[in-house]
């Protein structure tokens, strides 16, 4: 239901974005604290960040948390054992940061990757959800002036990477 409401807000242009400067490590620690107890048995959630806790982004923290939570929830659906690792790293282009969520799950086929951000697309028919979450994530990240990409290897796992500018107007 929330995904359908978000999709409606996106399409009507009524989804609000509140840009402000936010401490990225604190934002990600908050996500970790709320998500770690939701992991399936045998799956460990790992937060990986540089030592400094002084990374700030001008972004909408509510929407960014929504995206990271969605990516972690998706990873948990397809990871029966192992790790879901998320965090951030500086991009090779100065002024940008990469936020990532990677898992040791079942992976996504090349065909699946081609369609993964399409509305209503689901990798299989057995998982919950309407197939809207990743499409909504992509739209939110674009509104945050960023990009989202995916790499995957079947049976080895998947990595979603969100690339955002440190500052935007």
Predicted feature residues:
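Short alpha-helical Gxxx[C/S/T] motif in the catalytic ATP-binding
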Residues: 133, 137
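Helix-loop junction within the histidine kinase core
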Residues: 8-19
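Short helix-loop "hinge" at the ATP-lid/N-box region of the Bergerat-fold HATPase_c
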Residues: 75-76
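Short conserved segment of the HATPase_c
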Residues: 108-120
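A conserved beta-strand-to-alpha-helix junction within the catalytic ATP-binding
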Residues: 18-33, 46, 65
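Short conserved segments within the C-terminal catalytic ATPase subdomain
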Residues: 38-48
């Amino acid at each position: 239901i929330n995904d359908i409401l978000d999709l409606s807000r996106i399409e009507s242009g009524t989804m609000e974005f509140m840009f402000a400067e936010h401490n990225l490590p604190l934002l990600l620690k908050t996500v970790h604290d709320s998500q770690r107890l939701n992991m399936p048995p045998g799956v460990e959630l790992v937060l990986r960040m540089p030592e400094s806790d002084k990374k700030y982004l001008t972004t909408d923290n509510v929407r960014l948390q929504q995206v990271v939570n969605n990516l972690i929830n998706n990873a948990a659906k397809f990871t029966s054992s192992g790790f879901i690792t998320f965090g951030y790293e500086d991009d090779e282009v100065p002024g940008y940061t990469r936020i990532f969520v990677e898992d040791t799950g079942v992976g996504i086929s090349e065909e699946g990757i081609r369609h993964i951000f399409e509305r209503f697309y689901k990798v299989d028919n057995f998982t919950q959800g309407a197939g809207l979450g990743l499409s909504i994530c992509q739209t939110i990240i674009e509104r945050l002036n960023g990009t989202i990409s995916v790499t995957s290897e079947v049976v080895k796992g998947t990595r979603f990477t969100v690339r955002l500018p440190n500052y935007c107007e």
